[in-house]
């Protein structure tokens, strides 16, 4: 079996998805086209142009099905390469543009969100199989589509949202390496130090202002803790994260604590080892449709702590969630305080030699999701067989 896989904005989570998918189905001949995750407005509007005129030979080869991410401008790509319209097609949605928070920085550009929203709608309508990584992603997408269509002036087709409601939910599978048993020995001298990891992109949508508020209250409370600031960095880091680094350095120096790691860890094994040594994985996100960073840390033994919003209540119990002001992501002292209360409680448990609560994320491993992805691929190939049979049974003209 031969498949074409398109990833139009190949961010780290998108790469993890396609790599794990190929590991799950090694007998399929996968042929990939990807584009770097940068220049977002150009990438989502121009990917069809880039591929159609730079990679036509790859696009017009013989395939059994097409699997593409929702960032692909599939309707335009089919117009440029009509042969693609004959392939059974699955569209995988890692995120949607309807539930993306606005950057609070007044200096940040304010792109018009309608164009990427419309492009994602066109691509979804092209799909024979539409798949989301979480129910939260699916519901916010459908709600966003309905709201967008209600604002359009005229000639809006009826029933578009209903056409999309058949969409499946299949999460991005976690690599099997994060489920390998790891030794979590605790240094006696570290028993009173809570090891916290924040492993997210250094961008505004990951809630750096709330993270700063949490750290400020933790320091004011006198808690002995270490915070590892991981995740991808970019040329301009949000101001709260810049303040945070200096604050943490002073905190660790004052208490004689070895500072946590700060910065992206490119080596996968080293990254997993650090996560496996931490006590708590903290999220302050304003935007997460699955939360792969938190899931990986949880699989490696960290106790997760996340806001009670976005996708997190789908797979974390109430003991792992702190109260928030809602999905608007407004950072408040009360919001930080609820997270700090939980962290102080867990620090006390650790100091007493007690085990911290653990969340079960086994359902996200490759082996657990294999059957769901197999059913998806079977549905695609079955639709191809049906189409071929219908073609074979069509009477010849003349």
Predicted features along the sequence, with ranges:
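Aromatic "clamp/platform" in nucleotide-sugar-dependent glycosyltransferases that forms part
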Residues: 286
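A charged, aromatic-enriched C-terminal amphipathic alpha-helix characteristic of glycosyltransferases
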Residues: 42-46, 330-338, 345-384
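Conserved donor-binding/catalytic core segment of Leloir-type glycosyltransferases
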Residues: 187-206, 212-217, 227-230
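Glycosyltransferase donor-sugar binding loop
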Residues: 212, 226-243, 261-264
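Short alpha-helical donor nucleotide-sugar binding micro-motif in glycosyltransferases
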Residues: 272-278
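Short hydrophobic beta-strand element within catalytic cores of glycosyltransferases
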Residues: 303-306
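Nucleotide-activated donor-binding/catalytic signature segment of Leloir-type glycosyltransferases, i.e.
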Residues: 241-269
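Donor nucleotide-sugar binding/catalytic pocket of nucleotide-sugar-dependent glycosyltransferases
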Residues: 126-185
């Amino acid at each position: 079996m031969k498949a074409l896989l398109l990833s139009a904005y190949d961010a780290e989570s998108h790469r993890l998805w396609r790599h794990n998918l190929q590991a799950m189905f090694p007998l399929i001949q996968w042929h990939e086209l990807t584009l770097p995750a940068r220049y977002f407005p150009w990438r989502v509007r121009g990917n069809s142009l880039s591929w159609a005129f730079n990679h036509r030979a790859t696009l017009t080869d013989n395939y059994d099905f097409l699997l593409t991410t929702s960032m692909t401008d599939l309707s335009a790509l089919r117009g440029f390469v009509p042969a693609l319209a004959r392939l059974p097609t699955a569209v995988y949605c890692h995120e949607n543009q309807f539930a993306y928070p606005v950057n609070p920085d007044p200096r940040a550009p304010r792109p018009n969100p309608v164009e990427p929203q419309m492009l994602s709608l066109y691509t979804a309508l092209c799909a024979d199989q539409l798949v989301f990584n979480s129910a939260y992603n699916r519901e916010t997408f459908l709600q966003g589509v309905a709201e967008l269509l209600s604002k359009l002036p005229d000639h809006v087709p009826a029933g578009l949202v209903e056409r999309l409601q058949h969409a499946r939910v299949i999460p991005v599978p976690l690599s099997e390496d994060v489920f390998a048993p790891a030794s979590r020995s605790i240094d006696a001298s570290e028993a009173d130090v809570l090891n916290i990891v924040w492993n997210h992109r250094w961008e505004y949508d990951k809630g750096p202002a709330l993270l700063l508020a949490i750290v400020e209250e933790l320091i004011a409370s006198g808690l002995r803790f270490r915070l590892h600031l991981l995740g991808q960095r970019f040329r301009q880091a949000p101001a709260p994260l810049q303040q945070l680094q200096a604050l943490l350095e002073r905190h660790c120096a004052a208490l004689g604590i070895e500072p946590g790691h700060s910065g992206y860890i490119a080596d996968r094994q080293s990254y997993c080892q650090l996560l496996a040594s931490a006590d708590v994985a903290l999220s302050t996100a304003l935007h997460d449709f699955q939360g792969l960073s938190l899931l990986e840390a949880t699989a490696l033994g960290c106790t997760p702590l996340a806001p009670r919003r976005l996708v997190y209540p789908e797979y974390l119990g109430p003991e792992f969630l702190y109260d928030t002001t809602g999905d608007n992501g407004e950072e408040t002292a009360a919001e930080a305080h609820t997270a700090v209360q939980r962290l102080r409680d867990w620090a006390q448990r650790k100091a007493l030699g007690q085990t911290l609560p653990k969340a079960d994320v086994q359902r996200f491993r490759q082996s657990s999701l294999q059957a769901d992805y197999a059913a998806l691929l079977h549905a695609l190939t079955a639709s191809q067989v049906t189409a071929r049979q219908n073609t074979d049974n069509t009477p010849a003209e003349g």
